[in-house]
Every structure is written in C-alpha cells, then in structure tokens.
C-alpha cells in the first residue's frame, strides 16, 4: 500500500501526525484491538443508528424540519429544511443558528465540532448514559428556542 503513496505512487498524503511514531503506535494498537473485537464495528453502527434516530425523533416531535444525516457512527445535524445530499444543499444550513446550538451545548458540557459542516463521531467509548445526556441537552435546547 505504501508504494501507492507519493513519492513512489500517485497518491499524495499529508497530515499533522503523519509519520509521527506515537501516532503510528496508537494506530497499530487500535488495529490490534479491532482485530480482537470485530463486533465493535457492528456495535458502533447500531449505536449511531439509535442515537441519530433519537435526534430525528426529537426534531419531528417538535415540528422542526431540520436534517439529520448519518452513516453508521458518523452524523451531522443540519439546520435547514432542505434535504442535504451534497455541498450545495448543505450550504443552505443556518450557520448562525448552528453557532447558538454549538455554544449552548458547550455550556452544557457537550463538546461538538465548532463548524456546521463537521461530522459528529461516536466511538465505542461513548456509553448509553453519555448519549442519553446529550439527547437531554438537545431536548433542553429545543425547548429554549
């Protein structure tokens, strides 16, 4: 695979921790854990389906036409009525409203990516209790707006 990466191959790759020995060791450890516990992927995807489904349910119950897109454990809440299928439709999101949501969640101890266009990432470390707490904070936000 390394022969495909520049300078030998045609794929350019760069990043903050590229080639960093600590990052490489962490990556190798992670791969070992995943080999030992292949069910983590299935569990994580099920967790994502449930969590993002709950956000969608909360929005629907309150008549909010916003979009919740997700694939497995990755998801994004878009503050737009338009179905989000690509960059153009994502750009219809109300980014100033997202800023209010972000700041509210941050004040509640829920750390999200600071951009409307960055995904939320669930991990095997997220417990049901943590996800429920997040949903409770989202509910509070929806009640306050």
In which residue ranges do the predicted regions lie?
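Conserved N-terminal phosphate-binding loop of PLP-dependent enzymes in the Aspartate aminotransferase
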Residues: 1-145
């Amino acid at each position: 695979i390394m022969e495909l990466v520049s300078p030998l191959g045609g794929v350019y790759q760069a990043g903050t921790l590229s080639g960093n020995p600590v990052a490489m060791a962490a990556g190798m450890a992670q791969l070992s854990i995943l080999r030992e516990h292949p069910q983590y992927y299935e569990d994580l995807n099920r967790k994502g389906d449930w969590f993002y489904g709950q956000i969608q349910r909360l929005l629907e119950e309150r008549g909010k036409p916003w979009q919740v897109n997700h694939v497995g454990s990755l998801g994004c809440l878009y503050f737009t009525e338009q179905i989000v299928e690509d960059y153009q439709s994502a750009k219809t999101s109300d980014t100033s409203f997202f800023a209010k949501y972000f700041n509210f969640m941050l004040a509640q101890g829920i750390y999200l990516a600071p951009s409307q266009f960055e995904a939320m990432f669930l991990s095997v470390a997220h417990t049901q209790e943590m996800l429920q707490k997040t949903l409770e904070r989202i509910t509070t936000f929806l009640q306050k707006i």
